[in-house]
Amino acid sequence: MFEVWRSFLSEIDPLEPEEMLFRPTSEANSIAFLVWHCPRIADTAFHRSQGMSTVWEQDKWYGKFGLAETDTGTGFAPDQVAAFRPTKKLLISHLESVQKALDDGLSQMASTDLDRPLNPENPRATLGRHIQSIVMGHGFFHLGEVRFLKGLQGRPFAR
C-alpha cells in the first residue's frame, strides 16, 4: 500500500523548490500540493473510518502548514493552491508521519477487520475497499499528476 508514497518521495527527491511549486496553468495543482494532499486524505479516510482523530489533528500539522484544521485540499481554489508553498522537508515529514500512523494502525488489524462494512445499508462498502479506493487509488491517480508535472519540466520519472 505504501508503494505510492515511496514513489512520491522518489519523485520529489531531486526537485528544486521552484520545481515543486510549478503549475503549468493558474488552474493546475503543484507537485508540493499533491504530495501534501494525498497523505492528508489518506490520514482522514483511515482514521475517521476507525473513529479516531487524525495525525493532522493530533500533531497539529495544520499549524505547521499554516492551514485550517479542516483543510484537506479538496475543493481548494486556484489562489489557495498558489499560496501553498511548503518546504520539501515539511512535506516529507508529514508524509512519513501519516505513513507510520497508518502502518501502525493496519498492523494491529486482523484481515477480517478489512471486511467490516462501513455502512450497514451497503455491506459491500467495507473498510478494505475504502482503503483501496481512497488511499491507494487516489494516491496513484495523483502520483500520475506528479509525474506529468515533472515531465513538463523536463524531469524524468524516478526509477
What is each of the regions a protein language model found here?
Residues 2, 9, 19-74, 117-159:
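Short, contiguous alpha-helical
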Residues 4, 30, 91-94:
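An acidic site on a long C-lobe helix of protein kinase domains
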Residues 6-11, 98:
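Amphipathic alpha-helical packing segments from all-alpha helical-bundle domains
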Residues 12, 35, 92-95:
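A generic alpha-helix structural signal
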Residues 13-16, 110, 150:
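A structural signal for long alpha-helical coiled-coils and helix-turn connectors
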Residues 70-116, 130-135:
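Acidic/histidine-rich alpha-helical segments that form the ligand environment
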